[in-house]
Every structure is written in C-alpha cells, then in structure tokens.
C-alpha cells in the first residue's frame, strides 16, 4: 500500500507540474513531510491524505490503491 501511495503521489504531482514545495504549500504541510511520504518513510494522517488527494485531484482510494467492494 505504501509503495502505491509513493508512486501515485509522484506521478500525480508530475502530471500537475508541481514541485514538492508547491504540493506541500497547497496541502498545508512542509516540503519535508511531502518528501518523507514520497520516500516511503511516513504514512500521512487521514486528514493529510484527504488534503493531498484534493490537491492531486484524485480520490483517497486512488492514493492508497483501496478497492471498494459492493456489499
């Protein structure tokens, strides 16, 4: 799951032509936090994951590769 998160963040950030610093500013965190997440050293909190997903224009499920199954 973490590997998918790091890859998705990097790909989506590149797609939007954002630097780590720009992503961090828009999400309200430090560039160091974004770097730690992309390096796989940190898993974001729920709130941060929601903010990152919004800035990156993806769903949280897409960030974490969560498959939703119908009941």
Kindly label every feature range from the protein language model.
Residues 17-36:
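Short alpha-helical DNA-recognition segment
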Residues 1-15:
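A short, Lys/Arg-rich alpha-helix, primarily the initiator
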Residues 14, 25, 54:
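Alpha-helical residues within the helix-turn-helix
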């Amino acid at each position: 799951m973490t590997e998918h998160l790091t890859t998705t963040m990097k790909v989506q950030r590149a797609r939007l032509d954002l630097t780590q610093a720009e992503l961090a500013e828009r999400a309200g965190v430090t560039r160091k936090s974004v770097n730690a997440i992309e390096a796989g050293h940190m898993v974001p909190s729920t709130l941060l994951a929601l903010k990152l997903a919004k800035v990156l224009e993806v769903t949280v499920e897409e960030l974490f590769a969560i498959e939703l199954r119908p009941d």
